[in-house]
């Protein structure tokens, strides 16, 4: 198994020992009714995502011989795609969905996987909904604040979101703005990674909240040099999606006039205006706007930590926690101080560092 495949799959769910036992022992010797060779009931199997990951990570050394290897791969693939319950079209969609998520920028991979889409169309809706939420800087402050709360609930865990300073919440939103901006930028690039006149189209201007040369202490998210200050588009080959001119956005929000191609995206968007949070936690009563956020929140009560580091085995309740942890192993430091160039693996460390710069400035002012 290559290092690249490990990195790509490392943010996915890693099965617990109990789940691994279910994966390897997919046939019961005897079911409760005494029938030998009975399969595990489909509604009692773990998440198909677990089997998809095991199928992709399976190594030849994991089996005693070639025949056993093929047999185990076949069984893992069956448990992932579930031909007994899925149609051919549904199986095709699962394979397409896997590849689509794999070609997304890493930030968007996490975002899409956290929303658990069941097919490619649902994944596209998740991305279009994100773009629409981040795409209108002229909205009222109260509405933008509500949007930010929804985004933060999606990006960080419940325990992480509580008590975060405003600057940290801004950083979470900015990460998504970079990814959303990349979608717009690549949409207008030619084969050389530039627009026709070599400049960014109006839609692709740097989001003001993340222009590192305007906001002291803001994050440098590791954007390639050619992409700084709105000079050019991203190089070709990372993520391209062309607009389908025949596909009209027929769903319109009565509150703000935004258009959506999917009714489900409009429903999610309207909750920003209404403040509706239909998904309530039975343990503590806290409500959320999306079911995926409720699933993440419930891990606070259950203690479930499905995201496991392949390097050291440490487990986390959220993808975002695992991604931050993995930087300890990779040495990646994407958060850069624009004042002195020092880099950090965690955004919180950068904010503490930036505070030291600000304190030094205050001392100089007092001395003067």
From Swiss-Prot:
Specify the superkingdom: Eukaryota
Q: Name one GO cellular component term.
A: nucleus
Cross-link Glycyl lysine isopeptide (Lys-Gly) (interchain with G-Cter in SUMO2) position reads 22, 27, 147, 177, 236, 277, 286, 361, 367
Keywords (alphabetical) are: DNA-binding, Isopeptide bond, Metal-binding, Nucleus, Phosphoprotein, Repeat, Repressor, Transcription, Transcription regulation, Ubl conjugation, Zinc, Zinc-finger
Disulfide connectivity? none
Which residues does the record list as Phosphotyrosine (modified residue)? 335
What is the purpose of this protein? Transcription factor required for myelination of differentiated oligodendrocytes. Required for the conversion of oligodendrocytes from the premyelinating to the myelinating state. In the developing central nervous system (CNS), involved in the maintenance in the progenitor stage by promoting the cell cycle. Specifically binds to the 5'-TCAT-3' DNA sequence. Has transcription repressor activity in vitro.
Name this protein carries in UniProt: Zinc finger protein 24
Q: Name the species this protein comes from.
A: Pan paniscus
